Amino acid sequence: MSTLYEIAASLKGNQQTVVDAITCEAPILRDLPMEESSHGLWNIYESMKNVTGGDLVELDAPLPTVGVESELQQTDLSIIGGEMEVGEDTARKLGGPAAYFARKATPVLRKTGMSAERRVLYNGFREFAIKNNNVISAGGSSNANYTILCVHYVPGEITGVYDAEGFGDGKTFDLAPIAGGNLYKNAEGQLVYGMRLKTYFGLQLANPDYVSAIVNCDITNDTADSRTFPTAMMIDDLLVNAKAGQNTFIFCHPKVKSYLGSINKLDRLTIQNNHFSTQIDAWNGVPILTSFNFDNGTEETVEI
């Protein structure tokens, strides 16, 4: 499956700068596998409820009946975007609205990507795992928690969804001046120039067996006598609960990855070339990807 970054960068319109800005602080969003939606702004898919497969039988014995029970479901695409405004006088002092928006675009796009990724992590994967009881509690109870996610991307089941038609011009991210680039009066009665960014995006979560989570991971209060951070066995269970295989990833805050390495690697640590490191990049072959768009130890305790 192609990723969000690969698809956006390959389409016409030379949007490399826009794509780089949106994904530079959103590494998980950047590498999210994407599929075309079936009907533009929504995607119709078949959710498997029960599968009966074949079996070994004796020679000349009747073959068992095989089949699939399923139901049609729909994923609606959402909008990633926002609007920027600049006052007439400010725009004039700074070289005009085009120059102003070009200067401000990069930090705005960066923040847009960060916000979108956070929604994918919390309102998408984490909420899906909790809703389907595919979740483990590490024991934290002081509202100073982190989350660790395991996501197994599967075509048609666990994937991002995009509208291939975009806005009719083939662009994934559409930036356009408001009011045709002319002055207009905003809600406060001020004369301004405006610019808006829009793209259509969805997250298809069709199989609860492929998304798992560990919540209530408290680093601050974790001790040998009172564990509030996942044990090695819990991390193993996290992978099992997502049926970890190809295209499976562990997602967490960088501090979680660092602490996970320090408590699980010190007893096997080797020092080479005078470099001391407890960094781990994978757990039993599953890559660990980090993002600062996870909350930094401020999550409320989840009742399991």
What are these regions (language model features)?
Residues 44-68:
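Glycine-rich, compositionally biased intrinsically disordered regions
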Residues 2-26, 30, 36-46, 66-304:
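Core alpha/beta structural scaffold of self-assembling particle/tube/pore-forming proteins
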